[in-house]
Amino acid sequence: MTAVNPLDHAEEIKQLFVADERPEFVPFFDRAYAAGVQAGGGSWVGRDSDGHIVMHLACFPRRFRFGERDVVGGLMRDALVARPYRSFFPAHALIKRATEDTRALGRMDFVYTNPNRHAKAVMDLCGFAQVGTLERYVLPVGHRRWIVDRPIGLVHAGVRWVRGGATLVPRAASEFSAVEFASPPGDSPRLRPYHNAAQYLARLEGYPAAADWWFTLKENGAGAAGLLVRGPDSSGLADLYAVRRDPRLPLARLISGLAVAVRANRCTRLQVWTLAESLFATEVRRSGFVPRQEAAPLVATALTPSGQAVLHAAHLWEITSLDCDH
């Protein structure tokens, strides 16, 4: 197992994924890996007796604000072992080496990821523990049939009136700079991510695309909230990828305003992924979102005392799928 700069082995790594019928990795590599390496990330590879890459794992840093301090999490992603070598011991050695190398560098406080069932079994034996469960939540905001859509619209209008729903301004992502929402605003005890343009470009293919919209709220002349939505797609489904807000703003107030805004764009359902055990998920549910069956474990291991504090505070995580490998 060797730590490498993935940019120096780009074609070999891409070929490993293509051979495993994961061609979507190639454009992701092209748009995400240079920024990941520049931020301090890297890859680990394993080779066969002929020197060909047959295993790969990457880890990229993600900055968070946790109460009054900054912490850095390492997002492990793109783990793959070629089929002839797909057994417990090679995968265990790869994950163990990557974790220990990351610990030795001293740049990150914890490492986290959302593995599939088989990878989780290996990670459990590498010192990773389950922090919680990433769960999908869906908010019905409309319907293609007017006889169903009309009552839904009346419900959202009523909820907005009762909650004092915010009037959000829609801004095409292609014409809007989200720099003012890069840092978590205000003071909060929660774990909240920093975001930058490179993360949006990496996570959302084609960003800023025609379907990418920021819905913003200003109070006292400053940006109080920004919500990033992609969609709706042809089925009417839109994704809520980022919630950047002053901690004093109730999520329900923002969502009631957002529901009315996305209805105007023929959205029928709005979905978001977050940690089910968190206070943020409680706010999501109280805003009208309904949990669905889709879920995935989120596991992590601490590298520093600050990282240990983060892992013991699952209820304080305020993340979405934008912050995970999901």
Feature-to-residue mapping (PLM):
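Short, high-confidence coil segments that cap the C-terminus of an alpha-helix
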Residues: 41, 104-108, 212, 264-269
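Alpha-helix boundary/capping segments in eukaryotic regulatory proteins
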Residues: 65-71, 86-90
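Conserved acetyl-CoA binding element of GNAT-fold acetyltransferases
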Residues: 70-83, 234-246
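Conserved acetyl-CoA-binding loop-helix of GNAT-fold acetyltransferases
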Residues: 81, 86-102, 248-260
